[in-house]
Amino acid sequence: MDKKILVVDDEKPIADILEFNLRKEGYEVHCAHDGNEAVEMVEELQPDLILLDIMLPNKDGVEVCREVRKKYDMPIIMLTAKDSEIDKVIGLEIGADDYVTKPFSTRELLARVKANLRRQLTTAPAEEEPSSNEIHIGSLVIFPDAYVVSKRDETIELTHREFELLHYLAKHIGQVMTREHLLQTVWGYDYFGDVRTVDVTVRRLREKIEDNPSHPNWIVTRRGVGYYLRNPEQD
């Protein structure tokens, strides 16, 4: 079955170009042109991926992303203005998986769409009870099969990308990973991507698993190199 992609952009020429190129790649494409319509179509279609413009009438892309994330975990790629760093950060902070800046190349956009769909496909949670391959790091427990994380027996709600990042760091506990390496392995980008995406996702993760996110003890920064996961409860 073709993957369903929802394109949300109030500029019809851009939406038409996106639809044309995505259909050429074999995707089933639907378009929405304002925020309210986008939310309704997400409920109706439950697409496999959303391309979401920040600037929309009625309800902007940030609010749409917030509403979608309350119920769904499909990849969301934000479409942002070229120089709008704040839009990029806000989009990632509220749960978007990635962003593409306008004007964008078709090659870059398709690469990001494929990478996000590939990660979603290969890491989809199983519909079964957690198995014995769970990872224990002190009071932090990761259940890869069920896509669940708990700390001190309390479930922690993570987005798809947050889980993937934490899981990867946990499998390589104590090893410092560069942002570029994490972008390639967790996000699946071979040549596209902004390492700021990694920084924002790490910050979101810290807010959820750290006792004091301002002074992280689990996900540690190695200045000038990258990040690594440790077990502070062993110290």
Curated annotation (Swiss-Prot):
Residues 4-117 form the Response regulatory domain. Phosphorylated by WalK. One of its GO terms (cellular component) is cytosol. It comes from the Bacteria. Residues 132-231 bind DNA. InterPro entries: CheY-like_superfamily, OmpR/PhoB-type_DNA-bd, Resp_reg_WalR, Sig_transdc_resp-reg_C-effctor, Sig_transdc_resp-reg_receiver, WalR-like, WH-like_DNA-bd_sf. Homodimer. This is Transcriptional regulatory protein WalR. It comes from Bacillus subtilis (strain 168). The lineage of its organism: Bacteria, Bacillati, Bacillota, Bacilli, Bacillales.
